[in-house]
């Protein structure tokens, strides 16, 4: 079994604290639409890639991306206070397309419908 390394621990803390920060401290209504789906750290812990999803139309996705860019400095400062790391990683925000991709696959499977299993010949 693989042990959890420092990268994973720091990523988990950033995800947890950032989610709480969005819910409780940031007053931008655009970020209410966002859900943090994951954080990936570089090996040197200098960059945290934050992935988020937004349910809704394309316009909401764009607005949430803009809101993250505008709040970037505030978010980084607040996370630095909470995490107590020697070096606060640079935050990069990315839209997580896996949910949209999953919905697309699901709709295609629904269109196809259930597959009939081939009948076995009687002996």
UniProtKB/Swiss-Prot annotation:
One of its GO terms (cellular component) is cytosol. It is found in: Cytoplasm. One of its GO terms (biological process) is maturation of SSU-rRNA. Keywords: Cytoplasm, Ribosome biogenesis. GO terms for molecular function: ribosomal small subunit binding. It comes from the Bacteria. Transmembrane segments: none annotated. Pfam families: RBFA. Its main location: cytoplasm. One of several proteins that assist in the late maturation steps of the functional core of the 30S ribosomal subunit. Associates with free 30S ribosomal subunits (but not with 30S subunits that are part of 70S ribosomes or polysomes). Required for efficient processing of 16S rRNA. May interact with the 5'-terminal helix region of 16S rRNA. Monomer. Binds 30S ribosomal subunits, but not 50S ribosomal subunits or 70S ribosomes. Belongs to the RbfA family. This is Ribosome-binding factor A. It comes from Desulfatibacillum aliphaticivorans. The lineage of its organism: Bacteria, Pseudomonadati, Thermodesulfobacteriota, Desulfobacteria, Desulfobacterales. The gene is rbfA.
């Amino acid at each position: 079994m693989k042990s959890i390394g420092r990268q994973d621990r720091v990523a988990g803390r950033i995800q947890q604290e950032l989610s709480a920060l969005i819910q409780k401290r940031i007053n931008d209504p655009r970020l209410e639409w966002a859900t943090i789906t994951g954080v990936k750290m570089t090996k040197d812990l200098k960059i945290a890639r934050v992935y988020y999803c937004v349910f809704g139309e394309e316009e909401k996705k764009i607005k949430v991306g803009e809101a993250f860019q505008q709040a970037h400095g505030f978010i980084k400062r607040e996370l630095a206070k909470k995490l107590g790391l020697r070096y606060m990683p640079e935050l990069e925000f990315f839209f997580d397309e896996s949910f949209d991709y999953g919905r697309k696959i699901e709709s295609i499977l629904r269109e196809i419908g259930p597959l009939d299993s081939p009948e076995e010949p009687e002996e």
